């Protein structure tokens, strides 16, 4: 997808960068016995110019739609029932809960975002795409990004290097075969990657990942193969955390979205700010939650200078505005405990 048109002279607005080089970190990393040194994580180049989002926007808002139904294990996936089923037995109601995402949730969410003319990034599990190819194609047909979420809905961080690469590449191949779009974005199961994942992703052609909740703006991490973008995640705006575990109702979630938006929008007058929200097919696709999202989107769209963007657009924008994008040099994840290059 092409980058949004912009004219630096016409659309650049004032901003004050507040990212400062971190003080020395001397926190022991559990399991390694080493301290994070002053040089383990640092800002490689401080932005020295004013910057904006496209067209002078003061806030970028990006939604993720998690397409997971059919990619979960038949037993032990977890859901709304607090008592886990006996190991090895099919969890019938939980699997039916996942099916809701295909038959009701995603179609309802797609219609809502069509109404508001907003495009999302859909993180798709390979097996989910294989089982519901028409739905995957429909997501892309409506202008949303097809991003990768693994071959199945399970951890991959403990796999050996070749197995991890296959796990990522297999899911990627399913998405490209069905939708015609090669994924450039990655989200791991519960954000847990191995120390080498980012290097693997880059070698496969990915531009960005979202598996780090450390900032409210995108940044670049240099890897051995070049620059790689991080588009930070937000746990507290993830519906899978808010609804089943915290026990929020739709009204409380809507208020949290508004509060997050208002604070970041205010900060956006002098800092580049970004708000990201993750929606799951089987959770936010329920009728009352879509109604709540509808009200929030109406509110957010009423504000001027807001850029609603897919995450691939944000990643490309970050790479095209290097003078204004933090570049974070990190040591190996086994030393820093943070995502980076294993080399």
Enumerate the language-model features and the residues they cover.
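Signal peptide processing junction and immediate N-terminal pro/mature segment
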Residues: 31-38
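Active-site-adjacent pocket scaffolds in enzyme catalytic domains
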Residues: 40-55, 173-271, 322-327, 342
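Metal-dependent polysaccharide deacetylase catalytic core of the NodB/CE4 family, i.e.
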Residues: 86-90, 107-110, 114-195, 218, ...
């Amino acid at each position: 997808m092409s980058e949004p048109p912009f004219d630096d002279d016409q659309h650049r607005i004032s901003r004050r960068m507040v990212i400062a080089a971190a003080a020395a970190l001397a926190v022991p990393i559990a399991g390694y016995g080493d301290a994070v040194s002053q040089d383990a994580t640092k800002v490689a180049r401080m932005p020295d110019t004013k910057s904006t989002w496209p067209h002078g926007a003061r806030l970028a808002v990006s939604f993720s739609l998690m397409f997971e139904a059919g990619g979960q294990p038949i037993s032990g996936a977890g859901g709304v029932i607090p008592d886990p089923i006996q190991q090895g037995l099919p969890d019938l109601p939980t699997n039916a809960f996942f099916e809701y995402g295909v038959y009701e949730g995603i179609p309802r969410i797609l219609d809502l975002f069509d109404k508001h003319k907003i495009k999302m990034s859909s993180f798709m599990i390979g097996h989910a795409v294989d089982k519901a190819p028409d739905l995957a194609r429909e997501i892309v047909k409506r202008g949303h990004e097809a991003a990768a979420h693994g071959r199945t809905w399970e951890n991959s961080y403990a796999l050996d290097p070749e197995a991890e690469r296959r796990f990522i590449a297999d899911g990627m191949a399913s998405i490209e075969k069905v939708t015609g779009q090669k994924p450039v974005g990655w989200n791991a199961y519960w954000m847990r990657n191995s120390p080498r994942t980012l290097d693997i992703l880059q070698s496969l052609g990915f531009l960005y990942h979202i598996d780090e909740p450390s900032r409210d703006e995108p940044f670049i991490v240099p890897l051995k193969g070049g620059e790689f973008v991080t588009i930070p995640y937000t746990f507290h705006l993830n519906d899978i955390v808010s609804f089943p575990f915290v026990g929020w109702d739709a009204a409380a979630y809507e208020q949290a979205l508004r509060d997050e938006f208002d604070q970041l929008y205010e900060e956006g007058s002098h800092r580049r700010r970004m708000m990201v929200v993750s929606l799951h097919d089987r959770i936010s696709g329920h009728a009352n939650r879509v109604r709540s999202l509808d009200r929030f989107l109406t509110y957010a769209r009423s504000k001027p200078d807001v850029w609603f963007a897919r995450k691939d657009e944000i990643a490309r924008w970050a790479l095209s505005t290097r003078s204004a994008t933090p570049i974070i040099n990190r040591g190996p994840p086994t030393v820093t405990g943070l995502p980076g290059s294993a080399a």
